[in-house]
Structures are given as C-alpha cells and as structure tokens.
C-alpha cells in the first residue's frame, strides 16, 4: 500500500535526489516566478519559526544559515543586490537604531482630549 505525505513547500535543489537515493519517489514541479516568490516568503516564515525554536547555539547557527539562504534567494529572484539591502539596513539603523540595547516596548501612553 502506498502513502503520499503532502508537503506543498519549497525545498532546496538537491532534495528530490536525496529522496530518490532513499529509494522513495516524490512528485515535484517547477514554480513560475510569482509562485516562487510566494513560496520563498512562506519558506522564510518557516525558517524564522525554526530560529525561534532553536535551543542550542549549533541549532541557531543552522537555522540562521537557512534564513540567509532564503533571503539570498529572495534577493536574486527580485533583482535586489546585497548592497541595496545593506544600504537600507544602515539607513534604518541610523534613523531608528539597532537592537543592541534590548529595549522591549510595552505600550505607548497618549493623553486623550476628553
């Protein structure tokens, strides 16, 4: 009896061959540009969740590497250079600061006109 586990997610380029080397069969297709961008963003969310769940430094390093891989793929798919991203990163850091001071914003209190 056959079972088919549904994944419906973007995978790294060598995953189909790795699955076949394990004597299994998989069904895949090549995404168009629009769907590729959508699934890259879904993959980024998946990897961010895995970063959040990482419990050791080694796990965190592996998950951060996955995040960087997806970010790089998103850049390439959209014709965005690393320099463009870093430029905006530096502008935002200059304007809004970084995350070095560990500040957690609890709330903003505003006076009402009542």
Language-model regions, residue ranges each:
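Flexible "arm" and connector segments at domain edges
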Residues: 1-114
């Amino acid at each position: 009896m056959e079972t088919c586990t549904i994944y419906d997610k973007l995978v790294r380029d060598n995953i189909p061959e790795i699955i076949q080397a394990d004597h299994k069969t998989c069904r895949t297709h090549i995404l168009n540009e629009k769907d590729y961008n959508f699934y890259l963003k879904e993959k980024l969310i998946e990897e961010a969740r895995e970063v959040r769940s990482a419990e050791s430094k080694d796990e965190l390093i592996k998950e951060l590497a996955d995040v960087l891989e997806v970010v790089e793929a998103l850049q390439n798919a959209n014709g965005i250079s690393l320099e463009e991203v870093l430029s905006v990163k530096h502008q935002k850091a200059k304007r809004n600061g970084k995350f070095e001071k560990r500040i957690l914003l609890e709330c903003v209190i505003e006076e009402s006109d009542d």
